[in-house]
């Protein structure tokens, strides 16, 4: 019943795969995974990075200036997170791997929250350029790391970045996008699923169960 949300269903199933504890799919969990993780974490970060770049730098990747300690720390985390996801995949630990994907998105969200480029723009636009350059490099890495789990969303990220799909060999790089590169048209990566939609699915499930009794 969600033909337009194959990645959401895929993500919900992957995060519920039994590895060290039993679990099962529920529509409420499907909604929660979408709204609280895909929308609030992954989609939110990608959207903020792209919208801020569009607003402050005419939708072009800004040049990177000198890096401050907070930038260096984010760059170091960016270098190691994709390899952790790859290691989890090699060990068939898919729930752990999807958690690693979200950790990369959380890194981006935290970096923007800590650097607050919207507060720095008027006083130091060059600094904002450096912040958004690094944020966009994280977005580009999400386009790589998300591909095994969320192939349609990964393709959408690359489309919004106007970037040719990259390979895992490039994952962890902070030089996937050059300064001056023109980005594509941004949009919401995921949309919130309202309670009424889930309630309809639960009612359908209830009717099917009754018909089988």
Give names to the regions the model predicted:
Residues 1-72, 163-189, 193:
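Catalytic adenosine-cofactor/nucleotide-binding cores of aminoacyl-tRNA synthetases and other
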Residues 1-4, 30-41, 70-78, 90-100, ...:
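Secondary-structure capping and boundary motifs in well-ordered enzyme cores
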